[in-house]
């Protein structure tokens, strides 16, 4: 799995460029915080919530 695939599966592929430009890798995903997501330009609360829920799943593995 790569970050672009993960974002596409979440229906949030519009953020692929932001994650790529900020060198966010699969290894970094579990460490992202709500503030990190805001810094990446994810301003919609629902999108941040969806990402944080998916990040929580990654933390379990």
Describe the residue ranges of each PLM region.
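Sterile Alpha Motif
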Residues: 1-21, 26-61
């Amino acid at each position: 799995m790569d970050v672009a695939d993960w974002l596409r599966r979440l229906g949030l592929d519009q953020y692929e460029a932001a994650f790529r430009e900020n060198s966010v890798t699969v290894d970094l995903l579990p460490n992202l915080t709500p503030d990190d997501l805001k810094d990446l330009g994810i301003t919609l609360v629902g999108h941040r919530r969806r990402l944080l829920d998916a990040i929580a799943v990654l933390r379990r593995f």
